[in-house]
Amino acid sequence: MKEKRTNVRWMFALAFFFIGVIAYMDRANISYIAKQMMDDLGMTKPQFGLLASFFSLGYALMQVPSGMLAEKFGPRKMITIALVWWSAFTILTGMIKNHGLIYLVRFLFGVGEAPMYPSNAVFNSFWFSKNEKGRASSALLAGSYFGPVLAPIVTIAIVNAFNWQAVFYIFGAVGILMAVLWAIIAKDLPEQHRMVNEAEKRFIMENRDIVATEKSSPPWNDFFKRFSFYAIAIQYFVVQFIITLFLIWLPTYLTEVFHVNFKEMSISSLPWLLMFFLILSAGAISGRVLGLGRSKFVARGVIAIAGFIVFAVSIIFAVRTGNLYVSIFWLSLGLGGIGISMGMSWAAATDLGRNFSGTVSGWMNLWGNIGALISPLLAGLFVEHLGWTMTFQLLIVPAVIAVIMWFYVKPDQPLIVSDDKAIEK
């Protein structure tokens, strides 16, 4: 009788979903206690926006190094260290009162979260088949944007029961517990895991998209000769610029434009809830399209382009209504579109990078987080001088640029064809 294949790899996809939930709850909670923090610490809007910018600076600077470290030391060690590190600095955020120190803490918090996505890319390259990578990547992404769905509910409950500082203490403790669990259950390769039977191991090893299990140094000179290496970074700059703007400023927008109070702020979770569902759906659809024999450009690029177009159209309608619920509907649809594009970005990064997926995804996420670094501060300045409507409408311009870039990403042409040689230009 043919041995039935185990599905241990999907257990790890679920684990990454929960890691994503924790990471983005830790990131998003600060936006729901913005007023309390600004009042207690005497911060202006631009100063508060700098907290997110310092996080993004630390996060961005460590993207490429963390991807290379994940390739060298394995995602098991990197994820464990990352969870403990960022959870410790989450806890410290609630303890610091000095402006300069809290900026430093948020910078180091960003350093700690940096290895999460590149390590996931390395893990997926070795644990999943070519056709499964889009769906596997969507698990962490879906968790990341289910985090903001839970964040307002949990944050508001903690603040009502204790104070805003307790939010950081409790969230940080959960992250440390997750680090312990991950260290116990995870292995870098399916060949190393005793729960993976021979049928699953054989399926993975025959169908994964890597050129060799042995690691070698990334051929940076060859990478820099390919415009697809720049294109995937530019479009992801746009993705994270837009997402971070809404992650930080959406609650404040709803308060100032629609007079939503703190107790009603859970409505701001709806855009992230739709993003969660669309990320999962896009990953599944992308895998199905590949299974039908279509190109990776169709399975990744066309879906990503559709996501940006949905965002651009939705944002126009979102700012031209005086009705809170209509605005939330269009904002939800728009952010859902960006979520689709984000999911395809990570799938395409593993397509391009293959066994250097940690490096390529780290490069992509570096530029994404440069966008995230400047977005909160720039948005704070634009809102003060131009207002919310014009600030949101201006986001259509980078969305159009991102659409153009996707025609140059070319996920069907990987950067690596052997262990030490990049493909010709």
Where are these regions (language model features)?
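Extracytoplasmic gate region of multi-pass secondary transporters
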Residues: 30-31, 226-280, 342, 346
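Helix-breaking motifs and short loop linkers at transmembrane-helix boundaries and internal kinks
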Residues: 42, 74, 89, 95-101, ...
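Conserved MFS/SLC helix-loop-helix module at the cytosolic interface between two early adjacent transmembrane helices
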Residues: 61-97
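Structural signature of the two symmetry-related core transmembrane helices
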Residues: 77-91, 298-315, 396
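Cytoplasmic helix-loop-helix junction between adjacent transmembrane helices
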Residues: 105-144
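C-terminal transmembrane helical hairpin of 12-TM major facilitator-type secondary transporters
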Residues: 297-344
